[in-house]
């Protein structure tokens, strides 16, 4: 049995940048175990499996897997899968579609060469002290931007948002894997434990996402779900309206640009992230 698949680069201004994604069509014939094995074989940050789609209604259901586990929500897989559906699968090439993922329905629209998703309302969880990070990083107290808190935020997947003062500290960041993992397990209430460092330097937003997967310290080239959390954080603490590009992946040679368009009004967060997707390849997977 063969099923078609596509490979794309997401949040990429050009090919061979951004975050890689494998998209599998006709995945309703696969078991959960088979999906996990395929995701592990591909070994991208995430792979998606389209289990149902209705072109006439511009809707689809997908499942998202890292090489280790299934995700309830993740940004770059939703953006990339939507691009594939709208530009390679749906013959009518709709500008708007709805993707169903485990946390619910995600509205997606395409405007020019950008695909945008609308995120769920955020939850702001625990705050932490900068001193906590001194035990498992090379950061000093002076490297943290104390104008903002350090806080775990979720819009479906949770991230600890860590404000850093400048690009130099962000670029030269070093983390102790063992001590970081102990801290995450001891302090994060959610099962998705990851750190999202950022700095705002001369109006440029730069970020890094680091987590422990497969007992390894890993850095993500572009993290849409973390970007929705960061956008919510900036709307709450920085400005009630934001249009900016989040630059991620610069320090691992996978330059990514994640577009922010957000507003906060009467405690309602309007969080949208967008990005460009580059088509890389298509083929058939022998199951």
Which residues are covered by each model-predicted region?
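Active-site proximal loop and beta-alpha junction motif in alpha/beta enzyme cores
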Residues: 1-73, 79-287
């Amino acid at each position: 049995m063969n099923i078609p698949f596509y490979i794309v680069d997401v949040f990429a201004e050009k090919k061979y940048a951004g975050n890689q994604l494998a998209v599998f069509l006709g995945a309703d014939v696969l078991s959960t175990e088979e999906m996990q094995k395929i995701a592990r074989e591909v070994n991208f940050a995430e792979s998606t499996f389209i289990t149902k789609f209705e072109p006439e209604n511009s809707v689809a259901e997908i499942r998202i897997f890292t090489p280790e586990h299934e995700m309830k929500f993740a940004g770059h897989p939703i953006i990339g899968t939507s691009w594939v559906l709208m530009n390679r699968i749906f013959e009518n090439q709709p500008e708007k579609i709805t993707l169903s993922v485990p946390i619910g329905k995600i509205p997606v629209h395409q405007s020019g060469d950008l695909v945008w998703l609308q995120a769920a309302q955020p939850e702001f969880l625990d705050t932490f002290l900068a001193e906590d990070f001194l035990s498992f990083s090379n950061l000093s107290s002076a490297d943290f931007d104390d104008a903002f808190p350090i806080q775990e935020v979720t819009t479906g997947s949770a991230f600890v948002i860590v404000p850093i003062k400048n690009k130099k500290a962000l670029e030269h960041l070093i983390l102790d894997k063992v001590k970081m993992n102990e801290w995450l397990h001891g302090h994060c209430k959610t099962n998705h434990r990851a750190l999202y460092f950022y700095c705002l330097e001369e109006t440029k937003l730069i970020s890094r996402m680091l987590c422990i997967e497969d007992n390894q310290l890993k850095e993500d080239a572009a993290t849409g779900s973390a970007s929705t959390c960061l956008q919510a954080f900036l709307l709450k603490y920085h400005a009630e309206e934001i249009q900016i590009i989040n630059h991620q992946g610069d320090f691992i040679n996978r330059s990514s640009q994640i577009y922010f368009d957000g507003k906060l009004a009467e405690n309602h967060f309007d969080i949208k992230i967008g990005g460009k997707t580059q088509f890389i390849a298509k083929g058939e997977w022998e199951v």
